[in-house]
């Protein structure tokens, strides 16, 4: 066909295709071919394409028997469609039977290898085992073969081959045999990790890899399994995948290779300063916020936080989280938290938890925590006193990362903890003795995306301590950049607190976003019988640089409807360095 129009050089061509009869022309018109073309080659391609589409409709003997050039810009092609094949009889085979009668006149002789694994194909496709043939509309042949291969692949026959052989035409009927070579049914035997050259000194934690292999043990190898493996490796914040996983088939094993490189998952933020207090003594002030991950190649998470304003408050917190200890689904985490308020009291809390990993994102912990509090001034009053408390705790943690998003890598985080225990005080007031206590804390955060440019960050925080009596130095401290903004750090105290912390974020570019600050909270302090509503509001901006994320926030707050003063605006600047 291309040769027929090879010498035509008109700029615009019109193509008219007709059939040998009026009925055939109607069939051709129903296919809706393209009639306008820019050159002769396009016309030839269109005629060939139409012929292929006619074949798929059952006109397997269609042919062009007349080409006409009407004028310089108009061409005509005439098709003879032939008889339409309505259906196809596919011989699938039966365990112990000969081919059906419909094939007896055929000269084709089937061999055992050509009709292979018939029971397998019948089981997987849900076909009647008592029948040896399948009758399909001719137009469904392609979808039947594709769907069959897909089902085979889903059931571990990744190298299966399926095709029709010995195709014959008898009048308006097509006869064929289904040739099926299943190969060996493949399970995923091993997941192998390889690091890029730039991260050749890195290693993937052995406990993590063992749990991944255990999860997929005796799992059919198919594209869905490979996709799940790829998604599971995306849950680890300390590595990134440089390309899609690859499958290695050997006669005896099937392995999936995952290609990784080290991700910058360590964070540092802080400053240290010096100042003189009222008595002229040199004091430290500033803060340090450090988070390390997989530093000792065990997938561990270590966090260190220190903050001092030089006078009123000092906070020190250190924690470590060890997942998959002894290469089991068991995890261990521990924490120490020291808080000192002026020269009034100091609290030292220690906690240890043993956890079970449902998966890497979801963990359940049972633990023990204890707090020792010292009344530095030895007032031993009903509001401040030395005390010790102990709790048995249960904790559920869930987190989901969005590592494609460089500014907001944490998409969801949920932590729920409940503790049952008691407090012992030694003062001579009504708070003396042993008091049973219960507490619950809830922290839940999620990013809701309206579209790629607009996002709402919702953060819910709740704390409740149930006790017959309360003392000031056991109350929950909050306020500041990580809770209700617009208030000084840890300037508020409560036995019950609930807060909804929100940001509307407008993403200017992948490295820049603007956001609002709108926080609401309610708290109760039974040591002073005080209840109040809190409101925090403001604006902020975030900028991703080569080395981390720079955040600048302006916020103000109101306590129970107090007048808002511009002079109370709090400006916070954080530069979180990643390494």
Predicted feature locations:
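A short alpha/beta connector and helix-capping loop motif
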Residues: 529-541
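Short, solvent-exposed loop/turn segments at secondary-structure junctions
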Residues: 522-526, 560
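Gram-negative/organellar outer-membrane beta-barrel architecture
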Residues: 222-415, 477-480, 491-494, 506, ...
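C-terminal outer-membrane beta-barrel translocator/porin domains of Gram-negative envelope proteins
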Residues: 275-280, 393-508, 516, 524
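Bacterial Sec-dependent N-terminal signal peptides
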Residues: 1-16, 579
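Outer-membrane beta-barrel proteins
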Residues: 59, 339-345, 425-435, 559-564
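Interaction-mediating elements
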Residues: 11-236, 240-247, 253-256, 265
């Amino acid at each position: 066909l291309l040769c027929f129009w090879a010498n035509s050089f008109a700029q615009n061509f019109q193509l008219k295709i007709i059939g040998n009869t009026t009925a055939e022309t109607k069939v051709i018109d129903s296919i809706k071919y393209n009639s306008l073309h820019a050159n002769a080659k396009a016309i030839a391609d269109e005629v060939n394409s139409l012929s292929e589409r006619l074949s798929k409709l059952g006109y397997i003997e269609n042919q062009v028997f007349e080409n006409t050039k009407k004028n310089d810009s108009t061409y005509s092609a005439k098709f003879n469609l032939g008889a339409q094949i309505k259906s196809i009889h596919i011989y699938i085979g039966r365990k112990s039977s000969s081919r059906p009668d419909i094939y007896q006149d055929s000269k084709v002789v089937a061999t055992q290898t050509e009709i292979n694994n018939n029971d397998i194909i019948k089981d997987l496709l849900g076909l009647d085992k008592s029948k040896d043939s399948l009758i399909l509309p001719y137009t469904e042949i392609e979808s039947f073969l594709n769907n069959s291969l897909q089902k085979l692949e889903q059931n571990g026959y990744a190298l299966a081959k399926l095709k029709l052989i010995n195709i014959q035409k008898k009048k308006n009927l097509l006869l064929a045999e289904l040739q099926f070579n299943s190969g060996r049914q493949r399970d995923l035997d091993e997941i192998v990790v390889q690091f890029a050259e730039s991260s050749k000194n890195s290693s993937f934690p052995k406990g993590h890899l063992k749990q991944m292999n255990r999860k997929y043990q005796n799992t059919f190898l198919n594209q869905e399994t490979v996709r799940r493996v790829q998604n599971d490796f995306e849950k680890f914040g300390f590595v990134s995948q440089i390309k899609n996983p690859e499958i290695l088939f050997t006669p005896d094993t099937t392995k999936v290779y995952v290609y990784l490189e080290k991700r910058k998952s360590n964070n540092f933020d802080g400053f240290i300063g010096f100042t003189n207090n009222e008595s002229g003594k040199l004091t430290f002030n500033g803060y340090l916020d450090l988070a390390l991950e997989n530093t000792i190649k065990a997938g561990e998470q270590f966090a260190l936080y220190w903050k001092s304003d030089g006078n009123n408050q000092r906070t020190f917190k250190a924690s470590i989280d060890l997942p998959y200890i002894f290469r089991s689904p068991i995890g261990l985490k521990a924490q120490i938290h020291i808080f000192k308020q002026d020269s009034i009291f100091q609290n030292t809390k220690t906690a240890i938890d043993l956890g079970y990993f449902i998966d890497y994102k979801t963990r359940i912990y049972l633990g023990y925590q204890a707090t020792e509090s010292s009344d530095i001034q030895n007032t031993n009053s009903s509001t401040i006193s030395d005390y010790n408390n102990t709790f048995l705790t249960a904790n559920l943690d869930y987190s989901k990362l969005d590592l494609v998003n460089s500014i907001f890598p944490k998409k969801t985080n949920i932590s729920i903890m409940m503790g049952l225990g008691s407090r012992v005080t030694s003062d001579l007031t009504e708070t003396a003795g042993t008091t049973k206590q219960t507490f619950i804390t809830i922290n839940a955060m999620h990013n809701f995306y309206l579209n790629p440019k607009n996002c709402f960050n919702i953060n819910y925080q709740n704390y409740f301590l149930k006790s017959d009596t309360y003392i000031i130095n056991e109350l929950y401290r909050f306020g500041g950049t990580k809770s209700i903004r617009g208030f000084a750090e840890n300037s508020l105290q409560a036995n019950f607190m609930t807060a909804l912390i929100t940001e509307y974020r407008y993403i200017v570019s992948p490295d820049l976003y603007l956001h609002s600050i709108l926080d609401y909270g309610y708290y109760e302090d039974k040591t002073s019988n005080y209840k109040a509503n809190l409101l925090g509001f403001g604006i902020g901006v975030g900028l991703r640089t080569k080395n981390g994320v720079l955040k600048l926030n302006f916020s103000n707050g109101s306590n129970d409807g107090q007048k808002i003063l511009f002079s109370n605006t709090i400006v916070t600047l954080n530069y979180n360095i990643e390494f």
